Design a protein with these regions (language model features):
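Catalytic binding pocket for nucleotide-activated donors in carbohydrate/polymer assembly enzymes
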Residues: 44-46, 52-187, 191-201, 205-227, ...
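Catalytic cores of eukaryotic secretory-pathway lumenal/extracellular enzymes that build
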Residues: 1-40, 45-48, 224-228
């Protein structure tokens, strides 16, 4: 399923990037072999951080913190570190969507029937029809059939359940982006309030609350030759 989702992303990219109306406005790019080094190019350039994991179903990472520190605003669920980011920046500076962990648990307990949500969300049938028609697969109507069956059959990550809420949050993003002074203020607040996620704070708190380790002063006593001769090594510390 993961490989099929990647194929789906690239299929969307083929359509969007070939649309002349989108030229200079929007491009879809899949970053293969994503790692920290590549992230160093993405984090400073991002305006919006999409943290779309279903509440309670994903281990917390640090990518959302790095986006926040670089001034990107967050659209996300109450999952992982998103909760702490929202607490730091305030509700008005975070684009929240989706059910809570308790809401997901209740939905699962009641018996989740994703197919019943299709008719209640006007945009959802259109999206599913585009996928089913082969619009993103060069006319191949069967390529993404497993993806459709997964979504409409049992939807283990409750994607359809959070879809309408996500659209509303994206509308709020568009309105904020149109008001550039407001957006810039929100961006600055995200950076200014990211201190909670610094490694200094984390290590200090681990020392105090978990490791219960005391500070131990270290004194380095060695002479350093400020102008060493070529090929000459500095003396090692005792």
């Amino acid at each position: 399923m993961a490989k099929l989702i990647i194929r789906f992303i690239n299929g969307i990219a083929d359509v969007v990037n070939a649309d002349p109306d989108m030229d200079g406005r929007l491009r879809v790019i899949f970053l293969a072999d994503y790692n920290v080094k590549l992230g160093e190019r993405v984090y400073p350039a991002a305006d919006l951080s999409e943290q779309i994991s279903t509440a309670g179903l994903e281990a917390s990472g640090t990518g959302n913190m790095k986006f926040m520190m670089n001034g990107a605003l967050t659209i996300g669920t109450l999952d992982g570190a998103n909760v702490e980011i929202r607490e730091q920046v305030g509700d008005d500076n975070f684009f929240l969507f989706g059910r809570t962990t308790e809401g997901i648990a209740a939905l699962r307990h009641e018996g989740y029937r994703p197919w019943e949500l299709i008719a209640s969300t006007p945009e959802l049938p259109e999206v599913l029809h585009l996928i089913e028609s082969g619009h993103f697969s060069n006319g191949d109507k069967e390529l993404f059939r497993p993806l459709l069956d997964n979504l409409t059959g049992h939807d283990p990550f409750f994607v359809l359940a959070d879809f309408a809420s996500y659209l509303q949050a994206q509308q709020a993003v568009s309105e904020a982006w149109a008001d550039r002074p407001r957006w810039n203020r929100m961006s600055l607040l995200n950076t200014a309030r990211s201190g909670l996620f610094s490694s200094d704070r984390s290590i200090r708190e681990y020392c105090e609350r978990i490791w219960q380790a005391e500070e131990f002063p270290v004194t380095i006593t060695c002479e350093i030759d400020e102008a060493p001769a070529k090929g000459r090594r500095l003396p090692a510390a005792p």
